[in-house]
Structure formats: structure tokens, C-alpha cells
Amino acid sequence: MNPHDRIVQHFHESIRTKQMAMDALTESIADAGHLMAQALQAEGKILSCGNGGSAGDAQHFSSELLNRFEMERPGLPAVALTTDSSTLTSIANDYSYQEVFAKQVRALGQAQDILLAISTSGQSGNVNAAVAAAHERGMAVVALSGKDGGEMAGLLAERDVEIRVPSDVTARIQEVHLLAIHCLCDLIDQHLFGGA
């Protein structure tokens, strides 16, 4: 297949996956946006975590809340647990990589907070440990996942919200995760501040 055809194929696959996700995920994204907005109204914050590209997504989400998304508004409290290399490496060295997010959740998380847990497979041990730690702290969890939801799906409590992308392709899952993050940011802004 020539480069042009490969590029077109990627676009078509992305469009198909987003169309399936639109049908399958609208309600769960709306539920997650409402849950997050309620937490922020109750003076809670949103902690986020993930590995690799999902770490970048966690940081992207936090930056949109802390700064602004598409409207002028005050900053909102959000912390990406993926950014402090001293903390991450000290926890990994002294305990294990499995604990790098969970220890931060236990230190920073309160019952009114939300954990945004991002894993394309649901099999990321350190993200799953963070989900368990969030529950220990009385927090709700919004899980961005894909494939069959993996181990993370089985860890979720009744009040948690899973946004599971209907795909087995990591790149397509990541593309929908970014769109879902933008939808969540918009829903939070609309809920808290009304129309732009």
C-alpha cells in the first residue's frame, strides 16, 4: 500500500471509530462530565494519571482545567500525577512502579475529589492501583479505557463512570480519548459557567 492510501485508511478508521464511539459513549461522557462538575462545585479537585500517551492525555486534561478550555473562566483545580519526576522516581525506587500514582492519590485525594484514570487496555497496573487507592479515599473514578476494559473495568464501583472506546487498536482508542477529554472540558465549563 502506498503512503497516500495508508494515510487515507488511517483517516477512515479514525472516523469509523469516532462514529461508533459517538453512539456508544455519549451517555457515559455526559455522566462523567456531570460527576466532575459536581466535584468541582463541592470544592473538590480532579487528579489524573496514565502511562505513555495516556500520561500526556492526563496532563492535557489538567492543563485545560487549570488554564482554560474554549472560554474565559477562572482556573479549576486539577493535578496530573504524571509530571513530577522526583516524586515518580522516588516512589518507583523506594516501593515499585506499581505505586507511583497510588501513593500520590493517598496523599492528595479527598472524598470530594475525582480520579481520571486513563489506560487504553485497562491493564496498567499502576493506574489500577490508583483506582483502588481512590476508592480507599472515598473518591469516585472516571475511567477512560478501550478494548474489553481490562482489569480496570472490574475495579470500578457503582458510582464510577467508564468511558470504554469500542476498538482494539491503541491509536484509535487514544484518538477517541482525546475527543472525550475535550467533551469533558466543555461539559464542565457549560455546567459551571454556562454558555460562552
Curated annotation (Swiss-Prot):
- The UniProt gene name for this protein comes to gmhA
Involved pathway(s): Carbohydrate biosynthesis; D-glycero-D-manno-heptose 7-phosphate biosynthesis; D-glycero-alpha-D-manno-heptose 7-phosphate and D-glycero-beta-D-manno-heptose 7-phosphate from sedoheptulose 7-phosphate: step 1/1
Residues binding substrate, per UniProt:
51-53, 64, 93-94, 119-121, 124, 174
Location of the SIS domain: 36-196
- Family, as annotated: Belongs to the SIS family. GmhA subfamily.
Question: What does the record note on quaternary structure?
Answer: Homotetramer.
Give me the residues that bind Zn(2+), please: 60, 64, 174, 182
What is the name of the protein in this document?
Answer: Phosphoheptose isomerase
Q: How is the cofactor bound?
A: Binds 1 zinc ion per subunit.
